[in-house]
């Protein structure tokens, strides 16, 4: 009996291993059919099997490449019908030998040799891999414990799939919470007028101000005149009945006017909404023209006209030189000369706007104007009664593709939905795997129209439409708020000369210049003109004198009256044609002292052989404004320059012919005060000052008569920087002139 514990203990170990291996197989994942471990056939005598000693019951499993024992991996379970087919229990596995009466040796028998423990043999080589067994039956294991969630995977990179078929309209959901008031939308186009609804119940009398006059309605059809009924007898006044609920009756026949009742109490001020803005009235007549504006400033002096040709020289004998008479009185104003050529256009006048004219009489009522612009959208009215369910809306824009959900249970086959509109062609996908050919399905019936879906989101803003027809001119709006200062623009081109500005305040006169050195004593001047004395007071009558001696012979008497005309003389001899003006001048006669000047100052030979004199005279204009201060002003545009005594490059006139000269200058003032001086040999002999007023173009002029000797210089100059507003332009000329009155 001492031998029994070994085989029984070995049997229990084998059963435990078999059951544990079955549990392990049901709990893992399935990776395919693995070969069973090689079974070591028991070495049995005729009846008693031979077992290995305790501690080496488990056969050796060869290791795979990954370090795990072959056949010991956890099989992976798949979904569906992919459970591993394990061999049916107690059929394919060789049953262990039963330990019963057969394992116990009978009396008289010999003890099995397996009970005698021998030496451990050498480790054998692994046997060849056996053929795969038949698939086992699906296991029914206990679900394992839920594993921990794995680490978050990398974000998938996929291409957008094809748009899915439009789903069936869902059932009407519960009404959502009231959303916030959205922004005020744009005024939509005027809808088609709906059918006239039934008349509503008679409302309470409103308290409001009368609105504006409405548009005249269309005249209704003229009704038939009914027969005039007879007045019935007046009945007794019955008790006051309950308030009825009836429709307002037709208006009754107008009764006779009643007696004028007492005035009622003044009612409370009405509270009502302002009426609709009326249409703009007809345009009134034009007002009377305003009073004429003030005359603009005087334009610049025009260009002097062209001097006419000289007259034909007279024919006469030179008379004797008479005694120079006393200077006569100034002559009267001569007759008006011929008008000169029209000057260039003056500067535009600056006139102030006239006073508004009196209000004109009210004009006749005009034709009703065109329909005015559409008014602003009124306040939001009370919500109306819910209308009937509308037609199903258009399918909404497909939303973004959501994350893949868990695989659900296969649902029943749905009905065929409404064929949606053809979607836009998607991007070309990658070629997929070859699928199995499917069975052709049956065409489903068209389902009933679904409930009205929820309003879709507001679509994107459409593209700008075509430019519409310009609308009617609207009512001028109110003055808007002051805009933000804009970005300074680029510097523009220089504009045309502006209108002369107004003169500013007069500036201080600069200090006088440093007195120059004392000049050399001049030549003695010419004798003065004979004086004109007034007769004195008559003296007392003296006593008669003694008769005087015989006086000298008296002066010849006055010439007698002209005698009778003499006989006709010989035919006249015409002198040759004189040269053009400016080439020479005739003999200038006596000088200031009554003596003829010598013909030594530039005498020229005329075309007819006689002496000719060119007058020293000039007129020059300034073309550029604001010349430099402290230097002669260069009047650089010449109109006339006799004998070339004026140099336009320096602005200086140099005397060549001694005599008495007359100089004049005319200057314009703009942008500042102007102070000019007429210089003779670097000494100012005359000053002219003009004050500038902003917005006005002012002018100043001066003239002087100077006695010049050969070599004397005359010019204009501005002595101070504080008054240097000497201006000139294309149509605004500043000029400098001078000419010889008579030589010395």
UniProtKB/Swiss-Prot annotation:
Question: What tissues contain this protein?
Answer: Expressed primarily in the subendothelium of large blood vessels. Also expressed in arterioles and venules in muscle, heart, kidney, spleen, umbilical cord, liver and lung and is also found in connective tissue layers around hair follicles, around nerve bundles in muscle, in the dura of the optic nerve, in cornea and sclera, and in the perichondrium of cartilaginous tissues. In the kidney, expressed in mesangial cells, glomerular endothelial cells, and tubular epithelial cells. Also expressed in mast cells, and in astrocytes during the repair process. Expressed in Descemet's membrane.
- Where does the C1q domain lie? 611-744
User: What's the short name of a Pfam family annotated to this entry?
Assistant: C1q
Query: Keywords of this protein's UniProt record, alphabetized?
Result: Angiogenesis, Basement membrane, Cell adhesion, Collagen, Extracellular matrix, Hydroxylation, Repeat, Secreted, Signal
Alphabetized SUPFAM superfamilies for the sequence = TNF-like
Q: Where is this region: Nonhelical region (NC1)?
A: 572-744
Q: Enumerate the residue ranges of region (Nonhelical region (NC2)).
A: 29-117
**Where is the stretch described as Disordered?**
115-393, 459-589
* GO BP term, pick one: angiogenesis
Does the keyword Electron transport belong to this entry?
no
Give residue spans, biased composition: Gly residues. Answer: 203-217, 328-337
Q: Where does this protein reside within or beyond the cell?
A: Secreted, Extracellular space, Extracellular matrix, Basement membrane
Q: Which residues form the signal peptide?
A: 1-27
Q: Which GO terms describe its cellular component?
A: collagen type VIII trimer; collagen-containing extracellular matrix; endoplasmic reticulum lumen; extracellular region; extracellular space
| Chain segments carrying region Triple-helical region (COL1) | 118-571
Q: Where is the composition biased (Low complexity)?
A: 168-178, 466-496, 538-556
Subunit structure and binding partners: Homotrimers, or heterotrimers in association with alpha 2(VIII) type collagens. Four homotrimers can form a tetrahedron stabilized by central interacting C-terminal NC1 trimers.
Per the entry, what this protein does is: Macromolecular component of the subendothelium. Major component of the Descemet's membrane (basement membrane) of corneal endothelial cells. Also a component of the endothelia of blood vessels. Necessary for migration and proliferation of vascular smooth muscle cells and thus, has a potential role in the maintenance of vessel wall integrity and structure, in particular in atherogenesis. Vastatin, the C-terminal fragment comprising the NC1 domain, inhibits aortic endothelial cell proliferation and causes cell apoptosis.
Extra remark: Four consecutive Gly-Pro-Pro triplets are present at the C-terminus of the triple-helical region. These may provide the high thermal stability of this region.
Annotated protein name in UniProt? Collagen alpha-1(VIII) chain
Q: What is the lineage of its organism?
A: Eukaryota, Metazoa, Chordata, Craniata, Vertebrata
């Amino acid at each position: 009996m001492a031998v029994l514990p070994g085989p029984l203990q070995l049997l229990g170990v084998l059963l435990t291993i078999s059951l544990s291996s079955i549990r392990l197989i049901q709990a893992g994942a399935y990776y395919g059919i693995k070969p069973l471990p090689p079974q070591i056939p028991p070495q049995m005598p005729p009846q008693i099997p031979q077992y290995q000693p305790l501690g080496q019951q488990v056969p050796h499993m060869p290791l795979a490449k990954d370090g795990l024992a072959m056949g010991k991996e956890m099989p992976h379970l798949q979904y569906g019908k992919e459970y591993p087919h394990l061999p049916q229990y107690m059929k394919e596995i060789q049953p262990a030998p039963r330990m019963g009466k057969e394992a116990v040796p009978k009396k008289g028998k010999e003890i099995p040799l397996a009970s005698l423990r021998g030496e451990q043999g050498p480790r054998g080589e692994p046997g060849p891999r056996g053929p795969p067994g038949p698939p086992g039956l699906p296991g029914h294991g206990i679900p394992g414990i839920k594993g921990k969630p794995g680490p978050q995977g990398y974000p998938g990179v996929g291409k957008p799939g094809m748009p899915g078929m439009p789903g069936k309209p869902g059932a009407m959901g519960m009404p959502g919470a009231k959303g916030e008031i959205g922004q005020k939308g744009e005024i939509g186009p005027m809808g088609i007028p709906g059918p006239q609804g039934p008349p509503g119940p008679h409302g309470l009398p409103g308290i409001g101000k009368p609105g504006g006059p409405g548009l005249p309605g269309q005249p209704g059809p003229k009704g038939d005149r009914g027969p005039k009924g007879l007045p019935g007898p007046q009945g007794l006044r019955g008790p006051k009945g309950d308030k009825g609920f009836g429709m307002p009756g037709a208006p009754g026949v107008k009764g006779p006017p009643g007696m004028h009742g007492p005035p009622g109490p003044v009612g409370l001020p009405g509270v009502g909404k302002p009426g609709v803005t009326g249409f703009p009235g007809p345009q009134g007549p034009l007002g009377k023209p305003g009073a004429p504006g003030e005359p603009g400033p005087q334009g610049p002096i025009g260009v002097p006209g062209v001097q006419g040709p000289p007259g034909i020289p007279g024919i006469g004998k030179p008379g004797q030189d008479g005694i120079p008479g006393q200077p006569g009185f100034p002559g009267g104003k001569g007759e008006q000369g011929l008008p000169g050529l029209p000057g260039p256009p003056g500067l535009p006048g600056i006139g102030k706007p006239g006073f508004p004219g009196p209000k004109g009489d009210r004009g006749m009522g005009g034709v009703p104007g065109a329909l005015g612009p559409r008014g602003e959208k009124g306040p939001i009215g009370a919500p109306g009664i819910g209308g009937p369910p509308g037609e199903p809306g258009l399918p909404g824009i497909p939303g973004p593709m959501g994350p893949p959900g868990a695989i659900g249970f296969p649902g029943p086959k749905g009905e065929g939905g409404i064929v949606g509109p053809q979607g836009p062609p998607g991007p070309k996908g990658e070629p997929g795997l070859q699928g199995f050919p499917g069975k052709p399905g049956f065409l489903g019936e068209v389902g009933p129209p679904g409930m009205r879906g929820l309003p879709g989101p507001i679509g994107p803003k459409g593209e700008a439409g075509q430019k519409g027809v310009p609308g009617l001119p609207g009512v001028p709006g109110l003055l808007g708020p002051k805009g933000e200062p804009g970005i300074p623009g680029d510097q523009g081109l220089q504009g045309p000369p502006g209108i002369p500005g107004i003169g500013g305040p007069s500036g201080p006169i600069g200090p006088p210049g440093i007195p120059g050195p004392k000049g050399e004593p001049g030549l003695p001047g010419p004798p003065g003109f004979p004086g004109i004395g007034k007769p004195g007071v008559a003296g007392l009558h003296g006593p008669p004198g003694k008769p005087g001696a015989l006086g000298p012979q008296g002066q010849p008497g006055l010439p007698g009256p002209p005698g009778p005309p003499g006989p006709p003389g010989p035919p006249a001899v015409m002198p040759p044609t004189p040269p053009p003006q400016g080439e020479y001048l005739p003999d200038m006669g006596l000088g200031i002292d009554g003596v003829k000047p010598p013909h030594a100052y530039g005498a020229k030979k005329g075309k007819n052989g006689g002496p000719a004199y060119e007058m020293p005279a000039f007129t020059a204009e300034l073309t550029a404004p604001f010349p430099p201060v402290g230097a002669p002003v260069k009047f650089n545009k010449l109109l006339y320059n006799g004998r070339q005594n004026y140099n336009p490059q320096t602005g200086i006139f140099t005397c060549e012919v001694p005599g008495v000269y007359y100089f004049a200058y005319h200057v314009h003032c703009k942008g500042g005060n102007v102070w000019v001086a007429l210089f003779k040999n670097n000494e100012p002999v005359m000053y002219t000052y003009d004050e500038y007023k902003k917005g006005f173009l002012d002018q100043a002029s001066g003239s002087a008569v100077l006695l010049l000797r050969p070599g004397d210089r005359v010019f204009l100059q501005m002595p101070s920087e504080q008054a240097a507003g000497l201006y000139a332009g294309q149509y605004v000329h500043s000029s400098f002139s001078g000419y010889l009155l008579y030589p010395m």
